[in-house]
A protein has these predicted regions:
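Positively charged, small/polar-rich N-terminal and surface patches that mediate targeting and assembly
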Residues: 1-108
Length: 108
């Protein structure tokens, strides 16, 4: 039996330089915040094509933990951005976030 969680992790993989736009759109749609991580594709030259479309090596990953109710609006807002209308310019997936908690003490 699968239990529905209250939160989901939204992973948005974008070409380098596009993460801030994705984060702005996500915030407007209800995201509380997020983390941007620099990334690099590590596939072979053949792997760097997605259904015949060249994929840039330099990437950024936007990670957002959001309440389930906001996830559809957040993903739709990001998908509608003009910079993501080109084929293979972004990849979005969501995963259930079953255990969410803060560690340590707040920074002063």
């Amino acid at each position: 039996m699968t239990e529905k969680t209250k939160y989901e992790l939204i992973c948005i993989v974008v070409n380098a330089g596009c993460a801030e736009q994705a984060m702005q759109a996500a915030r407007k749609a209800g995201a509380p915040g997020g983390t941007i991580v620099d990334a690099k594709g590590t596939g072979t030259e053949q792997d760097l094509n997605f259904f015949g479309i060249p994929v840039a090596r330099e990437k950024e990953i936007v990670l957002i933990v959001a309440e389930n109710a906001f996830v559809p609006a957040i993903t739709e807002a990001v998908k509608r951005l003009p910079c993501f209308t080109k084929p293979a310019s972004t990849f979005i997936c969501t995963l259930p976030a079953s255990d969410c908690f803060h560690l340590g003490t707040p920074c002063a």
